[in-house]
Amino acid sequence: IFETLAERTLALAQLERRKDPEAGFDPWLEDILEPVLEKCLRHGVKIVSNFGAANPRAAARRIQSLAVRLGIRSPRIAVVTGDDLSSDTYLPFFREALGDALDEARMVAANVYLGSDSVADALLDGAEIVVTGRVSDSALCVGPLLAHFGWARDDWTRRGRAVMAGHLLECGVQVTGGYFADPGVKDVPNLFDIGYPIAEVDADGNCVITKADNTGGLVDTRVVREQMLYEIDDPSAYLAPDAISDISNSVVEQMGPDCVSVSGVEGREWPGTLKVLVCQDGGWLGEGEISYAGPRAEARARMAADIVKHRLGGKLDLRIDLIGVLSIHGDDAGRRLARTPQGSARDVRLRVAAVHQDQKVAELVGREVTALYTCGPAGGGGVRAGLRQRLDTLPCYVPRSAIQSNYEIIE
């Protein structure tokens, strides 16, 4: 399983597809597959991944090209379809769900989070590689389990357990200590060589989480429990396209070094709605950065920010951060920075950013920050200016009955 897609990466993929109809899938697809493709085909190891992103058919074509380049046979590839809701058919649902937040003139794409049934069907049809676009992360795990064990599609208990196994595997090494580590509080050994997780799932859907021997990281009950609660609002009702998973009475036990069992998860019938991510044109993000160091560095950085505010404040809503003083805890309007008394920081980087629908206007941010080299306070350096297109992402829900998922075989 290669789980590579997030809401942000899908939005970026939509931008790439707008520029090039053969782009829009994971840009690292070949880097991911090249070391393993021949071995997987030789040993009958199936590959399931959402690296199709905004363009799974193009991803399948790229895999075929990779096989040719490697001098191996062409794999039997299935492309899961049905997540693209960009047609006008679905606009009434989006209008009702999003109201004034939806700007149809700026709408670029919409993708629904599919479940695993088409993944399972494709594997049962002999697919060696299943390429998806937007499916739930856990569906990449549930699909192979449905196909392998032959569970009834309405076996909600087993599906609910499979959802949790997939949830534990999502985001890769989080369940082996990544994102868990906090030095001196939650120590994890050898994060530089962290091992990816393995889920050993039995016919009832219960699982054991472990990792490869002689790798860094940690699998213990603390890590597993933390990942079980990751992004979950209600432990008794984790909503996924495949089932509603209930972990409120689950049992998490240490079975040995880097080996944890999870049992007692329950499942209920899947929700009647599916989540959709609507992407619409968000204009252009212009930004610029410049550093100040030494005595009175903070005062000089604040002066530089004031210069840019005077020059652009009437045209743009500026986000201003003083990295080294206040940045992550700041706000777009700058209220907290304004309330923060000037200190004596000696290593400060000013960042200015703004969004505008007009590319030329957004570009002014980087130009004004660059001008601070000679038109601003003393000792500024290390200027970086950037300009990139943005997409706004709007989540909503549509009736499951309105969605049709399927797959097609590409050989």
Regions found by a protein language model. Give the residues of each.
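Catalytic or ion-translocation cores adjacent to nucleophile or general acid/base/metal-coordination motifs
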Residues: 69-85, 142-183
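Short glycine-rich or small-residue beta-strand-to-loop segments that form or flank ligand, phosphate
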Residues: 19, 44-54, 130, 349-356
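Gly-rich Lys/Arg/Thr-decorated short loops/hinges at beta-loop-alpha junctions or inter-strand turns
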Residues: 7-22, 41, 85-106
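Short acidic, glycine/serine/threonine-rich loops at helix termini
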Residues: 11-15, 58-64, 68, 87-96, ...
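Active-site glycine-rich loop that binds ribose-phosphate moieties when present
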Residues: 109-123
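A conserved active-site cap/scaffold subdomain adjacent to cofactor or substrate pockets
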Residues: 159-266
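Gly/Ser/Thr-rich loops at beta-strand to alpha-helix junctions
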Residues: 6-8, 51-60, 134-140, 356-359
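C-terminal non-catalytic interaction/assembly regions of soluble proteins
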Residues: 264-411
